[in-house]
């Protein structure tokens, strides 16, 4: 079965969105058991805030990298389709 560029791109976009959603859900679960801020010392509160920020930055960076890879795969797939078309229909 031949796959069109649109099908391939849509699948990658869907997978990227699913992955980003799963990462966000995982982060929410990870921080769900955070102690009540009222019980934390200022140092521990600062520690939690820094840690949450770091986790979010890494998640954002990872999601961005996944999107970049998807764009690269889309470009390569388009190249392969073009090569295949040129091989099947030379001169067109």
Curated annotation (Swiss-Prot):
Subcellular location: Cytoplasm, Cytoskeleton
Disulphide-bridged cysteine pairs: none
Pfam families on file: KMP11
Alphabetical list of InterPro entries matching this protein: KMP11
Primary location recorded for the protein, binned into one broad class: cytoplasm
GO cellular component: axoneme; cell tip; ciliary basal body; cilium; cytoskeleton; flagellum attachment zone; microtubule; microtubule cytoskeleton
Keywords from the named record: Cytoplasm, Cytoskeleton, Microtubule
Residues that span the membrane, as ranges: none
An annotated GO BP: defense response
Subunit and partners: Monomer.
Misc remark: There are four copies of the KMP-11 gene in T.b.brucei.
Family assignment from sequence similarity: Belongs to the KMP-11 family.
Biological role stated in the UniProt entry: May be involved in the regulation of the cytoskeleton through interaction with the subpellicular microtubules. May be involved in parasite mobility and attachment to the surface of the host cell. Behaves as a strong immunogen during infection.
Entry protein name: Kinetoplastid membrane protein 11
Name of the gene this protein is made from: KMP-11/1
